[in-house]
């Protein structure tokens, strides 16, 4: 079994936890490596690998916050991920540092027995006829090059071919249940429990918008954009592409889903940390 461990960048605590986990995993009989930046922080550059090697692992471990988990997910493909939470909200990272060794070693042992329990969470991709985005675990945002007065886009949103909304807005956001607690929430969208199979469609500061709606997880959401020379499409706020407009951007669920190992997080306990 091969395990890759990634620590939050710039966090001495995360690096220390990752180092302890490396020893514990090796002691359990698995092959284990650290990401290059964590290995450098420990003064062991030869022990590090690039994060895209996570896709070839049997288990990935993210040590930090939800941002670290999403960073790992972008590189892990369908490799299961265990998240160690260092005191942040922790919708994805369920394991506290004091329980990290036991939780990760337990997953190693479960893998050896062929009994690893993995949960799946949907990911989204945006596309046009000529382009496809990087998968997003939280949300895809389609917006103008600028937000605010005098900016934004003219748009029409269709769900499975039926018109849902249209007009002028800063943009349109499509979120997974995982992403409902992130950017979607700050844009006035609803919380969606992770057990719900659905997607959120949320207009961003629309002049005459519809309320946000939760649609089927397999729905196809199409956003037609005009009134601007270009449109910006962002996956999880980090992978940003500028496309010429007018255009149509289609957002739908993609494969592989995000695969999560280890104990599940308590959704409602995590919500309390938002207040």
Swiss-Prot record:
User: What EC identifiers does the entry list?
Assistant: 2.7.1.23
State one molecular function term (GO): metal ion binding
One BP annotation, GO: NADP biosynthetic process
Q: What lineage does the source organism belong to?
A: Archaea, Methanobacteriati, Methanobacteriota, Stenosarchaea group, Halobacteria
List localization entries.
Cytoplasm
Origin: domain of life = Archaea
Q: Which UniProt keywords apply?
A: ATP-binding, Cytoplasm, Kinase, NAD, NADP, Nucleotide-binding, Transferase
Question: Which InterPro entries does the entry link to?
Answer: ATP-NAD_kinase_N, ATP-NAD_kinase_PpnK-typ_C, NAD/diacylglycerol_kinase_sf, NADK
Q: Which organism is it from?
A: Halorubrum lacusprofundi (strain ATCC 49239 / DSM 5036 / JCM 8891 / ACAM 34)
What Pfam families would the database entry show? NAD_kinase (PF01513), NAD_kinase_C (PF20143)
According to its UniProt entry, what is the function of this protein?
A: Involved in the regulation of the intracellular balance of NAD and NADP, and is a key enzyme in the biosynthesis of NADP. Catalyzes specifically the phosphorylation on 2'-hydroxyl of the adenosine moiety of NAD to yield NADP.
Q: Which cofactor does it need?
A: a divalent metal cation
Q: Under what name is this protein listed? A: NAD kinase
Q: Name one GO cellular component term.
A: cytoplasm
Enzyme class of the recorded protein, top EC level:
transferase
Binding sites annotated in the UniProt record for NAD(+) = 66-67, 138-139, 168, 170, 181-186, 205
User: What family name appears in the similarity comment?
Assistant: Belongs to the NAD kinase family.
**Which reactions does this protein catalyse?**
NAD(+) + ATP = ADP + NADP(+) + H(+)
- List, from the UniProt record, the residues annotated as the active site of this protein: 66
